[in-house]
Amino acid sequence: MQHNQLLEQLYSGHSLSTSESTALFNAVIQGELSNEQIAAMLIALKVRGANTEEISGAVAASLQNAKAFPYPNYPFADIVGTGGNGQNTINISTTSAIVAASMGAKIAKHGNRSVSSKSGASDVLTALSVNVNVTPEQARQALDEIGVCFLFAQQYHSGFRHVAPVRAALKTRTIFNILGPLINPARPTYHLLGVYAPELVKTYAETAVALEHQHSFVVHGSGLDEVALHGETQVAEIKNGKIEYFTLTPEDFGLKTQSLESLRGGEPQENAQYLTALLQGKGKAEHANAVAANTALLLKLFGYDDLKQNVQNVLAHLVSGKAFETLQKLTTY
């Protein structure tokens, strides 16, 4: 079907099938649509609300066009959020990725520059002297040797440059704001995915099933795209094609409720200082607790089922300073 027919289908309020969505997003990523067509398509999807098939198709097209990553023969995970929650916290998922890796898990973290905060994953890593532009082969080597690597979205999804000016001009959230966590080019075995809005938990969970995720958690934590300690966290667990919905509280992690204010971050350089202190075992208790809760859920994907025990193990590990050694090694690639 021609692009124009697919666009016409969207304009008339009809949904696209997964294969139709894949075809249309392939055209976008390969630069076959004008800015006006891309804008119209994104707004049509936004006004109606993209469904599971449309999101799955967009993910499929993104992965088909992504730069290849040498696939490992061992299980590994990603911990990544949509961003865009406007809360401007410290880089919790980036820190959790490094901590989990230094505890023996394998984490291929997909990330980008900041969406709405002052410091996205690649911003803070750059401030920490990590080269976010390593080749796929170098990233894979880091994953093999130290258990963690960073995949900079812009490097793997170069076709997204065709959408960038349109997104900038529209100044509103579009389907591209929710694609990021789902399009890790390493195609992880496990996923801990954070979403910026509670209504996205179900959409994301159903999309994860459509994408045949082996074992994933989707979380929204009282306004945050990660596990919260200032309120409840809504969770969807996706395993073997089935979804289970539940709520987690700070008590489930053996932790006390703490204010969201205590996790406020700043510019990349400031967040880098918080992160360094934390990995050296000298960080703020509230920062350590937030990272421990998120890392605890991440470790559950690797079979460590006791969240309270996981939290205690992470907190003890942070005090040891071993996680900082992992960060130092990451800067050598």
UniProtKB/Swiss-Prot annotation:
Reaction catalysed by this enzyme: N-(5-phospho-beta-D-ribosyl)anthranilate + diphosphate = 5-phospho-alpha-D-ribose 1-diphosphate + anthranilate
GO CC terms: cytosol
Binding site for Mg(2+) 1: S93, E226
InterPro entries, per the entry: Anthranilate_Pribosyl_Tfrase, Glycosyl_Trfase_fam3, Glycosyl_Trfase_fam3_N_dom, Glycosyl_Trfase_fam3_N_dom_sf, Nuc_phospho_transferase
Cofactor(s) this protein cannot do without: Mg(2+)
Cofactor note: Binds 2 magnesium ions per monomer.
Pathway: Amino-acid biosynthesis; L-tryptophan biosynthesis; L-tryptophan from chorismate: step 2/5
Tree of life domain: Bacteria
Xref: NCBIfam families: trpD
Family: Belongs to the anthranilate phosphoribosyltransferase family.
Protein name stated in the entry: Anthranilate phosphoribosyltransferase
Lineage: Bacteria, Pseudomonadati, Pseudomonadota, Gammaproteobacteria, Pasteurellales
Gene name for this UniProt entry: trpD
